[in-house]
Amino acid sequence: MAVYTQVSAEALGAFLARFDHGELLSAKGIAEGVQNSNYLVETTADRFILTLYEERTSTDDLPFFLDMLDHLAANGNPVPRALPDRRGVAIQQLAGRSACLIEFLTGVSISHPTAAQAYAAGAAMGQMHTSLAGFAQVRENPLGADTWQPFLERCGRDVDSIAPGLFDRAQTALTSVLAEWPRDLPVAAIHSDLFPDNVLMLGDRVTGVIDFYFACTDIRAYDLAVMHTSWAFDGNGENYDPAIGAALIEGYASRFPLSDVERAALPILARGACLRFLLTRAWDWLNTPADALVTRKDPMAYWRRFEAYRKDDLFA
């Protein structure tokens, strides 16, 4: 989450007047994340998340995201739904942006997960994949494998300001990964960004899965590979924890069957995931406005992960 668009108290109060969820008490911008502007809103009735959708999120995609959340919630998954106003409309306009008032879920994001927490998070993803087998809508992945080469070219040699020689190293890695990229694995609706900060927990129990704005239709096992890259390493990407990695896979498989073919593809899927996040982080590092309330994330943390997956089979 992040804040790019500022909203005045007066505008927010008028926005809330469209709903039956109390009057504004306070609103605080949330700096984490990079995609949209988010506020924690407290009213006389409850707490909510206000999301304003920035340029990277197409308003044409919002029905897919919201329908996916409704489908998951209806099937017992702990996800936040967008709340309709008195007229039954969920997608609003505020401060020149499309916006939604979203359910607030209890729990905290875990910075240093235990194996038990990783198992629970993996199981939560497996349960979502089970539920999404009945979700028919399709959204092409705007950051899928076919976009990575053009994305690197858009970044250009400016990435060398992040680390000397990074462009050439990324190009070599990308050529290798795309040559091996699987094209015949099962495809489904996926979250595609299930980092620890997008999972809320109380103890070892998952209480919320949030931030579905990268959700799309892509290789189902890629979702698990993304999760592995983000959960099983420290924040700098320097240290891999095999107990966490194994617990994620075990938890996932407890709720959704992972085929031998999918399991065998996890190493290449993880290397691809590392390059995807290297590239998007590099772009954000180079292009985030100086006055944006957003925490930039180190692209090189994902290059280190890529190197770890390249050198060893971390799924063995």
Q: Locations of the language-model features?
A:
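Active-site acidic catalytic loop and adjacent metal/ATP-binding pocket
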Residues: 31-44, 49-50, 82, 175-222
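Conserved NTP-binding catalytic cores of kinases and kinase-like/nucleotidyltransferase enzymes
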Residues: 1-86, 202-205, 315-316
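ATP-binding pocket architecture of kinase catalytic cores
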Residues: 43-137
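ATP/Mg2+ or Mg2+-diphosphate-binding catalytic cores
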Residues: 142, 154-156, 277-316
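A cross-family kinase active-site recognition segment
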Residues: 111-165, 185-187, 293-296
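An alpha-helical support segment within catalytic cores of ATP-dependent transferases
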Residues: 7-18, 136-137, 150-192, 202, ...
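Active-site activation/catalytic loop segments of kinase-like enzymes and analogous catalytic loops
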Residues: 221-257, 272-289
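All-alpha amphipathic helical-bundle segments outside canonical DNA-binding/catalytic cores
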Residues: 260-270
